[in-house]
């Protein structure tokens, strides 16, 4: 697994240079990391630079379930969401030549993790806890953080 540290500077430099990279990838590139690390943002940039299709698993799940993830958590619960997430990721791994932004908790599932490690190129995005907290603090789209002690919960997830 590759370890990348995503920064605003990297994003700016990639967008500014408008660099195109010829990607002869037979496997998917799967971006993995905590919520708020920048998987979707960086995934779109990599997709544009390589002409690979970009897929956001959370967006696909919302489309399939006809509701936002926060609503899925509220109405159906986290267990239902994780099952939908697993089905979506396993389906996407059968395709190729895509940049896939994984939901923050998807890689925790052993089946998902094993399939990604076997059938894709996984790229772990990481940043420090302070930056993650800033990026996710006021985001009400993240159901795992919509609790009273969300700062404590987030720090616990990070560990």
Walk through the language-model features, giving the residues of each.
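Extreme N-terminal, non-catalytic leader segments
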Residues: 2-25
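ATP-dependent small-molecule kinase phosphotransfer cores
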Residues: 53, 57-106, 110-117, 142-143, ...
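ATP-binding Walker
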Residues: 37
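Hydrophobic anchor at the beta1->P-loop junction of P-loop NTPases
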Residues: 31
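A glycine- and Lys/Arg-enriched "phosphate-lid" helix/loop adjacent to the NTP-binding pocket
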Residues: 119-159
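Walker A/P-loop
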Residues: 40
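P-loop (Walker A) phosphate-binding loop of NTP-binding proteins
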Residues: 34
């Amino acid at each position: 697994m590759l370890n990348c540290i995503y920064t605003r500077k990297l994003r700016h430099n990639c967008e500014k240079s408008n660099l195109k990279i010829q990607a002869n990838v037979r496997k998917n590139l799967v971006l993995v990391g905590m919520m708020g690390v920048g998987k979707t943002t960086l995934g779109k940039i990599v997709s544009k630079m390589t002409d690979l299709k970009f897929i956001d698993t959370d967006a696909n799940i919302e489309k399939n379930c006809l509701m936002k993830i926060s609503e899925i958590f509220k109405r159906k619960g986290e267990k239902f969401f994780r099952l939908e997430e697993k089905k979506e990721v396993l389906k996407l791994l059968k395709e190729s030549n895509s940049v896939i932004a994984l939901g923050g908790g998807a890689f925790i599932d052993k089946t998902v993790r094993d399939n990604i490690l076997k059938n894709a190129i996984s790229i772990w995005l990481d940043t420090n806890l302070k930056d993650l907290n800033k990026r996710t603090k006021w985001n009400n789209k993240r159901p795992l953080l919509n609790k009273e002690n969300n700062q404590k919960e987030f720090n616990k997830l990070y560990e």
